[in-house]
Structure formats: structure tokens, C-alpha cells
Amino acid sequence: MDRLQIIVVTYGRPDLVARCLSSVLRSIPEKTTVHVVDNNSPDDTAEMVAARFPEVTLHRRTSNDGFAVANNAVLTEVTAEYALLLNPDTEIEPGLLDHLLDGMDENPDVGMVGCRLVTADGILDHAAKRRIPSPWAALRYFALRLVGRTGSSYT
């Protein structure tokens, strides 16, 4: 049984998909399967994946039903201990996947983890930060929206 199954959903942008898959395959832990779900890209994305990354399982969809539908199509077949959903513009740093898996193994009460997102120049992407859900956080968010300060709810 796989320890990790990685799912990357694509719609075009073969350049980004190639960089994503290259970074994943450089860092891939043992017992990992990589799936690419192509959402009926209008370009040669699926063909590029098939030609350049034969070790990846390619799923070709006949329509673009969105990110969630494409992920769910593969998630129903996942038999691994863990699943990782990646956007195609993601690049994985060496050692990150092993670090995430070790963290999950050491914390069996945790059901999901996320990573810090940084821009191409290494700056933390504050727009991707989310707070822990709570009544206070929700109240603060909506109060800030009333005064037009939604950006500060992510800092």
C-alpha cells in the first residue's frame, strides 16, 4: 500500500505543470504515487505529462468541472495512508514531503496540515494564511469587513 498519493489538477499551463511535477519527483518519498488530473486542457498539457513524466498516473477528463470535482474523482480511489492535493503552480522544496509525513505520523490526532506559501522571490504570501476557525475569528472578520478592512484579517 502507498504511504502517500499526490494529486495535481491541471487546466493548461504545461510550463507550470512541468515545474511542479519535476519538483515533486525530486522530493518524492518511498511508497508514493503521483496522479495528474487534466481537466480537458485546450493545449498539450496532457500530452506533455504523458511524454515527460511516464511515472505519473494521468487521468484525462472530457470536461472541465473544476478543481474539487477533479480531485474527488481520484480521491475516491485513494488507498494510501495520506493524500496530498497540489495546485499545478506549486513547487516542493527538497525534504518537505518527508517532513510533512513525519509530522503527521508524530501527531495522530491531526487530520490535515498545510504549508507556508511563499512567492517566487521567497516572500510569505499573507493572502494564503487562514486563522483557526472560532466564533471570535468570525466576528472579527465580519466586523473588519463592515469598515472595509478585509486584508488585515489575514495578517
Regions found by a protein language model. Give the residues of each.
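Short beta-strand/loop segment that forms part of the nucleotide-sugar
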Residues: 31-40, 59-61
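Short aromatic/hydrophobic "clamp" motif used to bind/position activated sugar donors
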Residues: 83
